[in-house]
């Protein structure tokens, strides 16, 4: 249980996005403008999760 205390709630935790132009990683919070901090480009891609994602075929 102590390990979960270090994790911030999802609303406050910044997401990591990758710039579509210069490919740098940017941490963007919920109220931050969607813009690269290096080049100012506005198209950002969400970084792929490292957690296992499984889809069931039906």
Swiss-Prot record:
Assembly behavior: Component of the RNA polymerase I (Pol I), RNA polymerase II (Pol II) and RNA polymerase III (Pol III) complexes consisting of at least 13, 12 and 17 subunits, respectively. Pol I complex consists of a ten-subunit catalytic core composed of POLR1A/RPA1, POLR1B/RPA2, POLR1C/RPAC1, POLR1D/RPAC2, POLR1H/RPA12, POLR2E/RPABC1, POLR2F/RPABC2, POLR2H/RPABC3, POLR2K/RPABC4 and POLR2L/RPABC5; a mobile stalk subunit POLR1F/RPA43 protruding from the core and additional subunits homologous to general transcription factors POLR1E/RPA49 and POLR1G/RPA34.
Function: DNA-dependent RNA polymerase catalyzes the transcription of DNA into RNA using the four ribonucleoside triphosphates as substrates. Common component of RNA polymerases I, II and III which synthesize ribosomal RNA precursors, mRNA precursors and many functional non-coding RNAs, and a small RNAs, such as 5S rRNA and tRNAs, respectively.
SUPFAM superfamilies given in the database record: RNA polymerase subunits (SSF63393)
InterPro entries found in the cross-reference section: RNAP_P/RPABC4, RPABC4, RPABC4/Spt4
GO terms of molecular function: DNA binding; DNA-directed RNA polymerase activity; zinc ion binding
Organism listed in the record: Mus musculus
Principal cellular location given in the protein's record: nucleus
Zinc finger region(s), C4-type: 19-39
Gene3D superfamilies found in the cross-reference section: RNA polymerase ii, chain L
The entry's keywords: DNA-directed RNA polymerase, Metal-binding, Nucleus, Transcription, Zinc, Zinc-finger
Statement: the UniProt record of this protein carries the keyword Nucleus: yes
PANTHER family found in the cross-reference section: DNA-DIRECTED RNA POLYMERASES I, II, AND III, DNA-DIRECTED RNA POLYMERASES I, II, AND III SUBUNIT RPABC4
Metal-binding keyword on record: yes
CC per GO annotation: nucleolus; nucleoplasm; nucleus; RNA polymerase II, core complex
Similarity remark: Belongs to the archaeal Rpo12/eukaryotic RPC10 RNA polymerase subunit family.
Ligand binding (Zn(2+)): 19, 22, 36, 39
UniProt-recorded name of the protein: DNA-directed RNA polymerases I, II, and III subunit RPABC4
Lineage of origin: Eukaryota, Metazoa, Chordata, Craniata, Vertebrata
GO biological process: transcription by RNA polymerase II
Gene encoding the protein: Polr2k
Compartment annotation: Nucleus; Nucleus, Nucleolus
